[in-house]
Amino acid sequence: MGNYKFRISEMLPNAWFHKLKDVTKHSKPKNKASSSSSNTCSKKKPSSDSLPQHSYFSNSLVANNPPHHNSPRNSLHTKKMSKRKTLYKPSLKPLTPPPLLVSASFNKSKINDQDSSYSLFPAIETSPESFVYSFYEEDDDDEFVEFSNFKINTKNKAFTKQKVKVIDSVEKACTASKPIKKPQKSHLSVKISRDEDDNEYKAEKKYQRQVSSGRKPSAGINLKRVNSPRIQLSGTRRSTSRRSESKQDVLESFAVMKRSVDPKKDFRESMIEMIEENNIRASKDLEDLLACYLTLNPKEYHDLIIHVFEQIWLQLTKTK
């Protein structure tokens, strides 16, 4: 109750208000102009019964609603305010442009044609000067672009260059990822024809059936041993005096599969044993022996076999 304010309208009955209105009409005569203005005001004003008990007014509404009549002071005040508005200019701070590749510029004439709700930069509309913001490429295109119909031109030179670079990088990466086949080092010039390879492969299959199972396989490297270097040779390469011996060698010879911890040593011993048993001294017979070892063993040991064969070849040439 301390903050509550009593009004006269709440304390007096409604009949007293009608009497007071009649007294004011008879006692105070007014001019026609003033009476007409007062009548219009009284018509516009609602009765006290319809008014709410509490009324609140905000300063912002009063400031935003100017009076209807234009006094000379108010007209001067509005002119001063309009002049002041023209003095306020937007700050020319660097706006962060969007990350676009296509050139775009804004013109005041085009922005003013649209509504203020649609405009993206309202500060530019109210300012008296025209501010043009543009983002250019290397080509310096001056085309005006509306953001409603904004589309990126993919036919631009920058896009084509970038695509070409991406394709080149992908192709380079693919070529780098491909395994490069290293050329096999030919330590010794050995000529082997396809027919001889086929014959050697067939002979290998024949003599692998007669594998000896004397030793248990230990952990190591596979090693294949051939007891006769003349498995694939035909009878035309030999003289008639040694044809019978070659037939016996082919019948008696067989391949042995072993696992070795020191393959270099085992290859050397096997080659020396084959040369001594069969009395191999001719260069053609030695080449056939090397070809036989290369075909019966995997490619991983070809370099090692050739290296061992070169050492044996040098020893044979020195003894001669």
UniProtKB/Swiss-Prot annotation:
One of its GO terms (biological process) is negative regulation of DNA-templated transcription. Residues 26-94, 178-248 are annotated as: Disordered. Expressed in roots, stems, flower buds and siliques. One of its GO terms (cellular component) is nucleus. Residues 76-87 have a biased composition (Basic residues). InterPro entries: DNA_bnd_dom_ovate (IPR025830), Ovate (IPR038933), Ovate_C (IPR006458). Residues 32-41, 64-75 have a biased composition (Low complexity). Keywords: Nucleus, Repressor, Transcription, Transcription regulation. The keyword Transcription applies. Plants over-expressing OFP2 show kidney-shaped cotyledons, round and curled leaves, small rosette size, late flowering, reduced fertilization and round seeds. Transcriptional repressor that regulates multiple aspects of plant growth and development through the regulation of BEL1-LIKE (BLH) and KNOX TALE (KNAT) homeodomain transcription factors. This is Transcription repressor OFP2. The gene is OFP2.
